[in-house]
Amino acid sequence: ADVPGNYPLDTRGYSYYCTKLGENEFCKKICKIHGVSYGYCYNSYCWCEYLEGKDINIWDAVKNHCTNTNLYPNGK
């Protein structure tokens, strides 16, 4: 069965390019920033499993998941 997910977008609205297909540490980090625990390189772009529409764009993901108290003094 296919696992749902999405290609996350960076600050410019582009997908994250990757060269090492499959297991990819860069993509895993990117997916964690976008609020999900796992992703990999597929068709030369990072794919994040279970990435919801609301977190595809990096700015939305940061707003939804950031816990930086300097950016968000009241916490998130």
Curated annotation (Swiss-Prot):
Disulfide bonds join C18-C41, C27-C46, C31-C48. Pfam families: Toxin_3. The keyword Secreted applies. PROSITE patterns: LCN_CSAB (PS51863). Keywords: Disulfide bond, Ion channel impairing toxin, Neurotoxin, Secreted, Toxin, Voltage-gated sodium channel impairing toxin. One of its GO terms (molecular function) is toxin activity. One of its GO terms (cellular component) is extracellular region. It comes from the Eukaryota. SUPFAM superfamilies: Scorpion toxin-like. It is found in: Secreted. InterPro entries: LCN-type_CS_alpha_beta_dom, Scorpion_toxin-like_sf, Scorpion_toxinL/defensin. Expressed by the venom gland. The keyword Ribonucleoprotein does not apply. Its main location: secreted. Residues 4-67 form the LCN-type CS-alpha/beta domain. Belongs to the long (3 C-C) scorpion toxin superfamily. Sodium channel inhibitor family. Beta subfamily. Has the structural arrangement of an alpha-helix connected to antiparallel beta-sheets by disulfide bonds (CS-alpha/beta). Binds to sodium channels (Nav) and affects the channel activation process. This is Toxin Acra III-1. It comes from Androctonus crassicauda.
